Amino acid sequence: MSMHGSGPSGFAPGRLNHGVVDAPQFADAADPLFDKSSLPRKASGDGILLLADGGRFEGTLFGAEGFGEGELVFTTGMMGYQESLTDPSWAGQILTFTYPLIGNYGIHGGKSESRAVWPKGVVVRHAMTDPDHRDSIGTVSELLQAHGVPGIENVDTRAITRRVRELGTVLCIFGPKEKEQEMLKRLESMTSPELDDLVDLVSIDEPVVLNPGATDDLGQPLPRIGALDCGVKYNILRNLSKRFEVVWCPPDIDMDTLNGFGIQALFCSNGPGDPAHPGKATSARHTLANAVASELPVMGIC
């Protein structure tokens, strides 16, 4: 089940089995390493962004070649673009950055929130091609190329943001300007990503203990908790691991398996899509309901 096509080692796209991550090396597993000598060709030339309501925005293509299509959303952060791009919560969406300059400090090891770029496309005012930071290992465009994710820049992101605020949910597509008619046809038949089981796409398949035998400063064992993965970010797991022995769990884990790990509480992450989707999001809700019924302490984050 692949979302963005194939990519180099370290940038495995699509559905991932994080259970293969060696727990002591967990922090290193977030490093976005890529081989610049084998990157797919960068998209270039005139592009166009089409909205389902008839909106039309011209720009310039970057990132990977191909169409970006999905639900148009925006984020207002001035920094943290690498964290946003690798946040599973954006799976299936076209992510617009309202801050006009994206990529000025490059891409860095240990700053990603997962092992993939999850948006299906990226919209920016300007994507930096010459980041200014000594620790940068690449550009935003190279990150998108490595994951097969297209981007479009030199568009009026202020106007796009105002439109999304007025319309709410809106589907869109962008790609080469000369393929506008083809994109219009694709847009007519496009369905909402809410219909897809996005939690299944971004979550792990098997449970894994991240920090077995973890102790506090006095050498006492840390409490053991389960972390229900509905699209959890690495930084959440890192911080939980400082305070607990963490069992990273798939969203459809059953209570018997959970109880077998001897957890003392259950944590539920946020994630993409509709929590009412009849897939793994519903499985996670059932797991939480069973945990509450068994009087197991439950906590979450949004």
Write out the residue ranges for each language-model feature.
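Short, Gly/Pro- and small/polar-rich lid/capping loops
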Residues: S2-H4, G14, H18-G63
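Flexible inter-domain linker/hinge segments
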Residues: D28, A43-S44, V164, V170-R224, ...
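Feature captures the catalytic cores and cofactor-binding loops of soluble hydro-lyases/lyases
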Residues: K36, K42-S44, L50-E182
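Proline-centered loop/turn at the N-terminus of a beta-strand
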Residues: P150, R224, P297-M299
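Flexible gly/pro-rich beta->alpha loop and the following alpha-helix that scaffold active-site loops
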Residues: K233-G300
